[in-house]
Structures are given as C-alpha cells and as structure tokens.
C-alpha cells in the first residue's frame, strides 16, 4: 500500500517551531508499506521555524495577523498532486493542524481551543475520496 503521511509524524523537523511530532507506532506500522511524506506548509513556501498559523474564517492567519492563505493553498495543491501522482491508498495526518487536521482544528484564537473542522489539505484529500486517519487515533497512541 502507498500511504501519504504528514512528514512531521515521521521525524521531519517541519513544524512551525522547527521540531517534529515523531510517532514511533506510525513508523513501525508503516515498515511494510510505501510511505509518501509531505508537509504542505513547507511545500507552500513557509519557513521553518515559522509563526504559528490557525484558520480564521476562510483564511489562514499567523499569530501576528499576517494572511498565509495563499501559501497554505499552494502547499495543499502541491501535496495533493503528489498524492495523485503516487496514487496513495490513504493518508495519516497530524490532528488539529490548519492544513492537515481532519476532525478537529484550532479555532483561530491561538488559545489552544478546538472546533470541529478540517484543514485545507485534508479537505482536498476528501474531495478525491482518499481515506484519512489522524495520528492520534486509538491505533497510533
């Protein structure tokens, strides 16, 4: 199987703070599969480290009030093209992210509050009917 994975979960230092969300259980489960790592934020041209971003209405804003929507959309489209080119079977994404969150995302207040919703990249994967699992599902914790 070909599985698209948020690169931060595999140990790539691509999070906003320059770190990662390495998940040893995910890495172990993926040993027998073809892994396709992506970080839509980096693909969209955002730096690492960078100012944290959250979805505010229909835009992605950083904590200082800068609009990062174009970079998020660009990165999501590039990552989606990679998913299509590699013909991935499903995706494992980082929860809560404004790009990869699938069931819950931060609410745009930068206070750690969550709301029901999906990030830009998760929405694009859903439009192609690519199944999504979140890194914090019972299977990976």
Placement of each model-derived feature along the sequence:
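Divalent-metal-activated hydrolytic enzyme cores
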Residues: 43, 53-78, 82, 113-141
């Amino acid at each position: 199987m070909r599985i698209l994975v948020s690169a931060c979960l595999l140990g790539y230092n691509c999070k906003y703070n320059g770190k990662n969300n390495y998940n040893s259980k995910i890495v172990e489960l993926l040993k027998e599969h073809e892994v396709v790592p992506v970080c839509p934020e980096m693909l969209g041209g955002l730096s690492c480290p960078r100012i944290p971003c959250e979805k505010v209405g229909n835009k992605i804003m950083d904590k200082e009030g800068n609009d990062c929507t174009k970079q998020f959309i660009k990165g999501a489209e590039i990552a989606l093209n990679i998913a299509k080119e590699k013909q991935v079977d499903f995706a494992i994404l980082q929860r809560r992210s404004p790009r990869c969150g699938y069931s819950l995302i931060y609410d745009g207040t930068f206070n750690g509050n969550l709301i029901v919703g999906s990030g830009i990249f998760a929405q694009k994967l859903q439009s192609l009917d690519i199944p999504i699992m979140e890194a914090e599902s019972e299977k990976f914790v």
